[in-house]
Amino acid sequence: MPLKHLLILLFIAVAHGSAFPFTKLVLNDSVPPILMASLRMGLVLLILIPFWKFKIPEKKYMPSLIAFSISMGVMVYVFMTLALYYSSIISPVIVGSQLAIPFGILASAFILNENISPKKWFFIFSAFIGVLIIFFDPKLVDNFLGLFFASLMALAFAFAQVFSRQLRDLDISLTNAFTGLFGFVILLILSFLIEGDTISTIQSISRNSWILISYQAIVVSLGAHLLMFYLYKFYTVGQIFPSYSLFPIFGIALSFLIFGEV
Protein backbone atom coordinates (compact mmCIF):
# COMPACT_ATOMS: atom_id res chain seq x y z
CA MET A 1 0.00 0.00 0.00
CA PRO A 2 1.51 3.39 -0.98
CA LEU A 3 2.32 6.00 1.66
CA LYS A 4 -0.55 8.23 0.51
CA HIS A 5 -3.09 5.52 1.24
CA LEU A 6 -1.49 4.76 4.62
CA LEU A 7 -1.77 8.44 5.58
CA ILE A 8 -5.41 8.42 4.52
CA LEU A 9 -6.04 5.42 6.79
CA LEU A 10 -4.34 7.27 9.65
CA PHE A 11 -6.55 10.33 9.12
CA ILE A 12 -9.66 8.12 9.04
CA ALA A 13 -8.62 6.49 12.33
CA VAL A 14 -8.06 9.86 14.02
CA ALA A 15 -11.38 11.21 12.73
CA HIS A 16 -13.38 8.17 13.86
CA GLY A 17 -11.66 8.15 17.23
CA SER A 18 -12.42 11.82 17.88
CA ALA A 19 -16.11 11.35 17.09
CA PHE A 20 -16.85 9.52 20.35
CA PRO A 21 -15.66 12.05 22.97
CA PHE A 22 -16.95 14.97 20.87
CA THR A 23 -20.37 13.32 20.63
CA LYS A 24 -20.40 12.84 24.40
CA LEU A 25 -19.66 16.55 24.88
CA VAL A 26 -22.70 17.46 22.80
CA LEU A 27 -24.91 14.98 24.67
CA ASN A 28 -23.69 16.43 27.98
CA ASP A 29 -24.92 19.79 26.70
CA SER A 30 -28.52 18.45 26.80
CA VAL A 31 -28.85 17.77 23.06
CA PRO A 32 -31.08 14.67 22.61
CA PRO A 33 -29.23 11.75 20.96
CA ILE A 34 -31.57 11.09 18.03
CA LEU A 35 -31.88 14.80 17.23
CA MET A 36 -28.11 15.18 17.30
CA ALA A 37 -27.68 12.34 14.80
CA SER A 38 -30.33 13.93 12.57
CA LEU A 39 -28.66 17.35 12.62
CA ARG A 40 -25.32 15.78 11.77
CA MET A 41 -26.84 14.13 8.70
CA GLY A 42 -28.71 17.31 7.81
CA LEU A 43 -25.44 19.23 7.62
CA VAL A 44 -23.93 16.50 5.44
CA LEU A 45 -26.87 16.77 3.05
CA LEU A 46 -26.73 20.56 2.98
CA ILE A 47 -23.03 20.59 2.12
CA LEU A 48 -23.36 17.95 -0.62
CA ILE A 49 -26.41 19.35 -2.44
CA PRO A 50 -24.31 21.57 -4.79
CA PHE A 51 -22.21 18.52 -5.78
CA TRP A 52 -25.09 16.01 -5.87
CA LYS A 53 -27.40 18.23 -7.95
CA PHE A 54 -30.27 15.80 -7.24
CA LYS A 55 -28.98 13.18 -9.67
CA ILE A 56 -30.64 9.75 -9.50
CA PRO A 57 -28.43 6.68 -10.11
CA GLU A 58 -29.27 3.72 -12.33
CA LYS A 59 -31.88 1.33 -10.97
CA LYS A 60 -29.33 -1.47 -10.51
CA TYR A 61 -27.64 0.57 -7.78
CA MET A 62 -30.78 1.55 -5.88
CA PRO A 63 -31.16 -1.51 -3.57
CA SER A 64 -27.56 -1.24 -2.35
CA LEU A 65 -27.78 2.56 -2.15
CA ILE A 66 -30.93 2.45 -0.02
CA ALA A 67 -29.46 -0.29 2.18
CA PHE A 68 -26.27 1.72 2.64
CA SER A 69 -28.13 4.96 3.34
CA ILE A 70 -30.27 3.35 6.04
CA SER A 71 -27.49 1.32 7.66
CA MET A 72 -25.00 4.19 7.65
CA GLY A 73 -27.10 7.35 7.73
CA VAL A 74 -29.71 6.11 10.18
CA MET A 75 -28.58 3.08 12.16
CA VAL A 76 -24.87 3.77 12.69
CA TYR A 77 -25.34 7.32 13.93
CA VAL A 78 -28.41 6.78 16.05
CA PHE A 79 -26.91 3.70 17.74
CA MET A 80 -23.65 5.58 18.30
CA THR A 81 -25.35 8.51 20.02
CA LEU A 82 -27.61 6.20 22.04
CA ALA A 83 -24.58 4.12 23.12
CA LEU A 84 -22.84 7.23 24.43
CA TYR A 85 -26.04 8.65 25.91
CA TYR A 86 -26.59 5.53 28.03
CA SER A 87 -22.92 5.17 29.05
CA SER A 88 -21.24 6.99 31.89
CA ILE A 89 -17.79 6.20 30.45
CA ILE A 90 -16.72 6.33 26.81
CA SER A 91 -13.80 3.93 26.45
CA PRO A 92 -15.82 0.66 26.64
CA VAL A 93 -18.15 1.97 23.93
CA ILE A 94 -15.14 2.71 21.73
CA VAL A 95 -13.71 -0.75 22.31
CA GLY A 96 -17.12 -2.40 21.85
CA SER A 97 -17.49 -0.72 18.47
CA GLN A 98 -14.49 -2.78 17.35
CA LEU A 99 -16.96 -5.59 16.72
CA ALA A 100 -17.48 -3.80 13.40
CA ILE A 101 -14.24 -5.37 12.16
CA PRO A 102 -15.19 -9.07 12.55
CA PHE A 103 -18.78 -8.25 11.56
CA GLY A 104 -17.49 -6.50 8.43
CA ILE A 105 -15.17 -9.33 7.42
CA LEU A 106 -17.93 -11.89 7.91
CA ALA A 107 -20.44 -9.78 5.97
CA SER A 108 -17.97 -9.28 3.10
CA ALA A 109 -17.48 -13.05 2.92
CA PHE A 110 -21.19 -13.88 2.82
CA ILE A 111 -22.38 -10.97 0.65
CA LEU A 112 -19.37 -10.21 -1.57
CA ASN A 113 -17.81 -13.70 -1.50
CA GLU A 114 -14.48 -12.30 -0.31
CA ASN A 115 -12.05 -14.92 0.99
CA ILE A 116 -11.43 -15.24 4.75
CA SER A 117 -7.98 -16.60 5.52
CA PRO A 118 -7.23 -18.71 8.64
CA LYS A 119 -5.49 -15.68 10.17
CA LYS A 120 -8.66 -13.60 9.74
CA TRP A 121 -10.77 -16.36 11.32
CA PHE A 122 -8.42 -16.32 14.32
CA PHE A 123 -8.73 -12.53 14.48
CA ILE A 124 -12.53 -12.69 14.32
CA PHE A 125 -12.65 -15.24 17.15
CA SER A 126 -10.20 -13.20 19.25
CA ALA A 127 -12.21 -10.01 18.73
CA PHE A 128 -15.44 -11.58 19.95
CA ILE A 129 -13.70 -13.10 22.99
CA GLY A 130 -12.08 -9.76 23.83
CA VAL A 131 -15.35 -7.85 23.74
CA LEU A 132 -17.06 -10.60 25.75
CA ILE A 133 -14.42 -10.19 28.48
CA ILE A 134 -15.08 -6.45 28.56
CA PHE A 135 -18.79 -7.10 29.12
CA PHE A 136 -17.95 -8.91 32.38
CA ASP A 137 -15.99 -5.99 33.82
CA PRO A 138 -17.71 -5.06 37.15
CA LYS A 139 -17.21 -1.37 36.37
CA LEU A 140 -19.60 -1.68 33.42
CA VAL A 141 -22.65 -2.86 35.36
CA ASP A 142 -24.45 0.43 34.69
CA ASN A 143 -23.30 0.60 31.06
CA PHE A 144 -24.69 -2.58 29.55
CA LEU A 145 -27.35 -0.71 27.57
CA GLY A 146 -24.69 1.54 26.10
CA LEU A 147 -22.58 -1.47 25.14
CA PHE A 148 -25.64 -3.09 23.57
CA PHE A 149 -26.20 -0.04 21.35
CA ALA A 150 -22.46 0.02 20.56
CA SER A 151 -22.73 -3.57 19.32
CA LEU A 152 -25.69 -2.64 17.12
CA MET A 153 -23.71 0.32 15.79
CA ALA A 154 -20.81 -2.00 14.95
CA LEU A 155 -23.10 -4.41 13.11
CA ALA A 156 -24.72 -1.58 11.11
CA PHE A 157 -21.32 -0.07 10.29
CA ALA A 158 -20.05 -3.44 9.06
CA PHE A 159 -22.98 -3.87 6.69
CA ALA A 160 -22.62 -0.27 5.53
CA GLN A 161 -19.02 -0.91 4.49
CA VAL A 162 -20.06 -3.98 2.51
CA PHE A 163 -22.84 -2.07 0.74
CA SER A 164 -20.44 0.80 0.02
CA ARG A 165 -18.15 -1.64 -1.79
CA GLN A 166 -21.07 -2.39 -4.15
CA LEU A 167 -21.41 1.36 -4.83
CA ARG A 168 -17.78 2.07 -5.70
CA ASP A 169 -18.67 2.96 -9.32
CA LEU A 170 -21.05 5.75 -8.21
CA ASP A 171 -20.03 9.33 -7.61
CA ILE A 172 -19.06 9.69 -3.95
CA SER A 173 -21.05 12.90 -3.47
CA LEU A 174 -24.21 11.19 -4.72
CA THR A 175 -23.81 8.23 -2.37
CA ASN A 176 -23.19 10.38 0.68
CA ALA A 177 -25.93 12.86 -0.23
CA PHE A 178 -28.43 10.00 -0.24
CA THR A 179 -27.04 8.92 3.12
CA GLY A 180 -27.52 12.43 4.49
CA LEU A 181 -31.05 12.63 3.08
CA PHE A 182 -32.20 9.32 4.54
CA GLY A 183 -30.49 9.96 7.86
CA PHE A 184 -31.75 13.50 8.29
CA VAL A 185 -35.39 12.84 7.38
CA ILE A 186 -35.85 9.50 9.16
CA LEU A 187 -34.02 10.54 12.33
CA LEU A 188 -35.78 13.91 12.48
CA ILE A 189 -39.14 12.15 12.35
CA LEU A 190 -38.02 9.69 15.05
CA SER A 191 -36.75 12.55 17.20
CA PHE A 192 -40.07 14.37 16.86
CA LEU A 193 -42.04 11.25 17.80
CA ILE A 194 -39.79 9.96 20.60
CA GLU A 195 -37.93 12.95 22.03
CA GLY A 196 -40.49 15.68 21.24
CA ASP A 197 -40.18 19.48 21.41
CA THR A 198 -37.81 19.35 18.44
CA ILE A 199 -38.01 22.97 17.25
CA SER A 200 -37.40 24.58 20.63
CA THR A 201 -34.57 22.13 21.35
CA ILE A 202 -32.82 23.08 18.10
CA GLN A 203 -33.20 26.76 18.96
CA SER A 204 -31.61 26.21 22.37
CA ILE A 205 -28.49 24.36 21.15
CA SER A 206 -25.35 26.24 22.17
CA ARG A 207 -22.73 27.52 19.74
CA ASN A 208 -20.12 25.10 21.09
CA SER A 209 -22.42 22.14 20.42
CA TRP A 210 -23.11 23.38 16.89
CA ILE A 211 -19.35 23.57 16.29
CA LEU A 212 -18.89 19.98 17.49
CA ILE A 213 -21.83 18.73 15.41
CA SER A 214 -20.41 20.55 12.38
CA TYR A 215 -17.00 18.98 13.01
CA GLN A 216 -18.53 15.52 12.97
CA ALA A 217 -20.49 16.25 9.81
CA ILE A 218 -17.56 17.76 7.91
CA VAL A 219 -14.47 15.95 9.21
CA VAL A 220 -15.92 12.53 10.13
CA SER A 221 -19.03 11.96 8.00
CA LEU A 222 -17.67 13.74 4.92
CA GLY A 223 -13.88 13.69 5.19
CA ALA A 224 -13.28 10.26 6.67
CA HIS A 225 -16.11 8.48 4.91
CA LEU A 226 -15.42 10.00 1.51
CA LEU A 227 -11.80 8.93 1.81
CA MET A 228 -12.92 5.44 2.84
CA PHE A 229 -15.00 5.28 -0.36
CA TYR A 230 -11.92 6.37 -2.29
CA LEU A 231 -9.87 3.51 -0.85
CA TYR A 232 -12.58 0.96 -1.68
CA LYS A 233 -11.91 1.71 -5.34
CA PHE A 234 -8.52 0.00 -4.87
CA TYR A 235 -8.93 -2.47 -2.01
CA THR A 236 -11.40 -5.02 -0.64
CA VAL A 237 -13.31 -4.65 2.62
CA GLY A 238 -11.08 -7.30 4.18
CA GLN A 239 -7.96 -5.30 3.30
CA ILE A 240 -9.20 -1.93 4.56
CA PHE A 241 -11.42 -2.75 7.51
CA PRO A 242 -8.74 -4.12 9.90
CA SER A 243 -7.19 -0.62 9.97
CA TYR A 244 -10.37 0.38 11.80
CA SER A 245 -8.70 -1.10 14.89
CA LEU A 246 -6.44 1.97 15.07
CA PHE A 247 -9.14 4.49 15.98
CA PRO A 248 -9.59 3.39 19.65
CA ILE A 249 -6.04 4.59 20.33
CA PHE A 250 -7.02 8.15 19.43
CA GLY A 251 -10.54 7.92 20.85
CA ILE A 252 -9.40 6.66 24.24
CA ALA A 253 -6.55 9.19 24.35
CA LEU A 254 -8.97 12.05 23.68
CA SER A 255 -11.41 10.66 26.26
CA PHE A 256 -8.59 10.77 28.80
CA LEU A 257 -7.65 14.35 27.89
CA ILE A 258 -11.25 15.64 27.88
CA PHE A 259 -12.95 13.58 30.60
CA GLY A 260 -10.00 12.19 32.56
CA GLU A 261 -10.99 8.59 31.85
CA VAL A 262 -8.37 5.96 32.53
Regions found by a protein language model. Give the residues of each.
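Hydrophobic/small/kink-forming positions within alpha-helical transmembrane segments
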Residues: 14-17, 21, 70-74, 78, ...
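Specific transmembrane alpha-helical segments of multi-pass solute transporters/efflux pumps
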Residues: 18-20, 49-97, 133, 217-235
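Membrane-interface helix termini and inter-helical loops of multi-pass transporters
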Residues: 21-30, 82-86, 132-145, 194-213, ...
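Specific alpha-helical transmembrane segments that line the substrate/conduction pathway
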Residues: 35-43, 72, 81-115, 153, ...
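Glycine-/small-residue-enriched transmembrane alpha-helix faces in small-molecule transporters
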Residues: 1-35, 139-166, 185, 189
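Hydrophobic transmembrane alpha-helices of multi-pass small-molecule transport proteins
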Residues: 48, 107, 119-136, 155, ...
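Helix-helix packing/entry segments at the starts of transmembrane helices
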Residues: 39, 77, 92-99, 163-185, ...
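Hydrophobic alpha-helical transmembrane segments of multi-pass integral membrane proteins
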Residues: 4-8, 34-50, 67, 123-126, ...
